[in-house]
Design a protein with these regions (language model features):
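N-terminal initiation segments
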Residues: 2, 74-79, 83-85, 105-109, ...
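Juxtamembrane luminal stem/stalk of type II transmembrane Golgi/ER carbohydrate-processing enzymes
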Residues: 1-76, 89, 93-102, 110-120, ...
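Catalytic nucleophile-elbow at a beta strand-turn-alpha helix junction centered on a G-D-S/GDSL motif
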Residues: 79-92, 161-163
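PAPS-dependent sulfotransferase catalytic core
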Residues: 214-223, 232, 266-326
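PAPS-dependent sulfotransferase catalytic domain
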Residues: 44-64, 109-157, 163-269
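A detector of helix-start/N-cap boundary segments at the beginnings of structured domains
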Residues: 62-64, 74-79, 241-244, 292-293
Length: 326
């Protein structure tokens, strides 16, 4: 009878753990629900929302806004749409030729994806393994949402949220895009919609709180723009990123990166970082104040995250001895 009792307890514990694992990896539960469930079951699952994860010192973090030079083997730039990502990628490619590291650039994770695994992630991890065999440093670049298990120092760049949203709307309708993407947009009937309609329906290029998702992750709750998603994004920014910048101060950000990651980043050009224009062939119209208000209201998490990142950049620049004129 005694053994039967322990058998039942053990089986219950195993089933609870399996349920939690299914919950996490299927993204059907939020981290808050997971925490509550863990307490109910009598044990605790640590989530990245609530605790710091111990990592190698070579990766650094932003908890102290330190300017201490880091020498990681791998840097990952999980770039955000319409935030000078083409400009930065081109610059890093030039840096790689001068500094002798491997530069690899991959594609875009779909907004609809909610799985931890992804083909882009698999390819990046394969590149990391290859670079180690070659005893070379690596910079990987991709439009990929944050993953905890990429063994690298993260960097990223944000943009003023309203300007980024408007730019993304027009970019998705630019003839400069891949033909198959434009064809899909037209087949769905989303190509000629107004920015107001695109915002309301969250069509491609108009999803809400886009930047927050890149720092939060692929999980379903990261798409919501909720307080929980914002908290996770801020946590990851603090604990996994060597530096974050904002597009409006791109030259100062590159100066910080040069001091922070000297093996990967050269000083900015003397005449400054020249923004690469990728949205061509479209006429950008002004927006009304009511439309601007709609964009702001829909992207509250992005606005708060942008201000948070701006504050971190200014503090890190100060520690680097770099003056930012506002």
């Amino acid at each position: 009878m005694k053994y039967c009792f322990f058998y039942i307890i053990g089986l219950s514990l195993i089933m609870s753990v399996l349920f939690l694992m299914l919950c996490v990896y299927s993204s059907q539960c939020s981290w808050k629900q997971i925490k509550e469930l863990s307490v109910q079951r009598g044990y605790f699952i640590t989530s990245k929302n609530y605790t710091s994860v111990s990592r190698s010192r070579e990766f650094g973090d932003l908890t102290t806004q330190s300017c201490e030079p880091l020498h990681p083997r791998v840097v990952f730039y999980n770039r955000i749409f319409k935030s000078a990502s083409s400009t930065m990628s081109s610059f890093f490619k030039k840096c790689s030729k001068r500094l002798g590291y491997i530069f690899t650039k991959d594609f875009t994770e779909e907004w609809e994806n909610e799985n931890i695994s992804h083909p882009i992630l698999t390819r990046i991890q394969a590149q990391i393994a290859r670079s180690k065999k070659l005893n070379k440093k690596l910079m990987a670049v991709a439009h990929l949402y944050f993953r905890e298990d990429i063994d690298s120092a993260y960097i990223n760049l944000l943009r003023e949220p309203v300007a980024r949203f408007i730019s993304h709307y027009y970019y998705c309708r630019s003839p400069n895009r891949y033909a198959h993407k434009l064809k899909r947009l037209k087949e769905l009937g989303h190509f000629n919609v107004t920015i107001e309609k695109c915002l309301e329906k969250q069509y491609e290029g108009c999803v809400w709180n886009h930047m927050t998702r890149f720092f939060c992750g692929p999980q379903a709750f990261c798409k919501s723009g909720s307080d929980e998603a914002l908290a996770a994004a801020k946590h990851n920014m603090l604990h996994y990123y060597a530096s974050v910048g904002i597009m409006e101060y791109i030259n100062e950000f590159v100066m910080v990166l040069h001091k922070r990651l000297p093996d990967f980043v050269l000083p900015p050009p003397r005449d400054g970082m020249r923004k690469k224009k990728v949205t061509k062939g479209v006429t950008k119209n002004g927006i009304s104040e009511s439309t601007r208000s709609m964009i702001i209201n829909a992207n509250r998490a992005d606005i708060q995250l942008y201000e948070f990142a701006k504050d971190l950049l200014f503090k890190q620049a100060l520690n680097c001895g770099i003056k930012i004129v506002t």
